[in-house]
């Protein structure tokens, strides 16, 4: 199960961003080549494990840039529309600015197209430090949006624990990946995420 994902992670080159070990992978970076079979395998497993249902989820909320392709395939499979938390300000009515800090960057994100009566599933490629998800989840809570589920493809580092401690939300992921001795290691996560 998830053979394509695991293989792509194990074959990922590792680079340093400051003190942060960063693996370069189609899921997290769009390079090397992102194969449609990999995206489909991921979306199929999200649907199988977490069962996003249009009766209980109004929108999928993904985070630019690497959450977009996962949300797109998931939207096609579930018929649930998605919105993108962007890195660019549009100035639309109701736009909410969010400050995010990760292990290797800092900046603003902008939420549009989400209202207080929405029920959403948040999806992203990876939770690592938890900084991006913390910022987005706290903003959604302030907007009085009902967060039904938080899903990432990959759990790396302590981010899921940090998100749980600070927001109460459980981040459910497909696999756990880490960098050990300059190589990516991959562990299965049981079906519950």
From Swiss-Prot:
Pathway: Purine metabolism; IMP biosynthesis via salvage pathway; IMP from hypoxanthine: step 1/1. Keywords: Cytoplasm, Glycosyltransferase, Purine salvage, Transferase. Optimum temperature is 70-80 degrees Celsius. It catalyses: IMP + diphosphate = hypoxanthine + 5-phospho-alpha-D-ribose 1-diphosphate; GMP + diphosphate = guanine + 5-phospho-alpha-D-ribose 1-diphosphate. One of its GO terms (cellular component) is cytoplasm. GO terms for molecular function: guanine phosphoribosyltransferase activity; hypoxanthine phosphoribosyltransferase activity. It comes from the Archaea. CDD domains: PRTases_typeI. One of its GO terms (biological process) is IMP salvage. It is found in: Cytoplasm. The keyword Flavoprotein does not apply. Optimum pH is 7.6-8.2. The keyword tRNA-binding does not apply. Its EC number is 2.4.2.8. Its main location: cytoplasm. PANTHER family: HYPOXANTHINE/GUANINE PHOSPHORIBOSYLTRANSFERASE, XANTHINE PHOSPHORIBOSYLTRANSFERASE. HAMAP family: Hypx_phosphoribosyltr. Homodimer. Catalyzes a salvage reaction resulting in the formation of IMP that is energically less costly than de novo synthesis. Prefers hypoxanthine, has 66% activity with guanine while activity with adenine, xanthine, uracil, orotate, or cytosine is negligible. Belongs to the purine/pyrimidine phosphoribosyltransferase family. Archaeal HPRT subfamily. This is Hypoxanthine/guanine phosphoribosyltransferase. It comes from Methanothermobacter marburgensis (strain ATCC BAA-927 / DSM 2133 / JCM 14651 / NBRC 100331 / OCM 82 / Marburg). The gene is hpt.
């Amino acid at each position: 199960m998830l053979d394509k994902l695991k293989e792509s992670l194990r074959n990922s080159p590792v680079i340093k961003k400051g003190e942060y070990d960063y693996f370069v992978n189609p899921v997290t970076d769009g390079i090397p080549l992102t194969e449609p079979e990999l995206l489909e395998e991921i979306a199929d497993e999200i649907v199988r494990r977490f069962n996003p249902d249009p009766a209980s989820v109004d929108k999928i909320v993904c985070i630019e840039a690497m959450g977009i392709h996962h949300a797109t395939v998931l939207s096609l499979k579930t018929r649930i529309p998605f919105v993108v938390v962007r890195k660019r300000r549009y100035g639309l009515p109701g736009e909410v600015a969010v400050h995010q800090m990760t292990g290797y960057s800092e900046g603003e994100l902008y939420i549009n197209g989400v209202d207080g009566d929405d029920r959403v599933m948040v999806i992203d490629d990876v939770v690592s430090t938890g900084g991006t998800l913390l910022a987005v989840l706290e903003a959604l809570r302030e907007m009085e949006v009902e967060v039904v589920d938080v899903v990432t493809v990959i759990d790396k580092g302590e981010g899921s624990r940090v998100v749980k401690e600070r927001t109460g939300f459980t981040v459910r992921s497909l696999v756990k990946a880490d960098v050990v001795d300059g190589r990516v290691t991959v562990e299965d996560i049981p079906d519950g995420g």
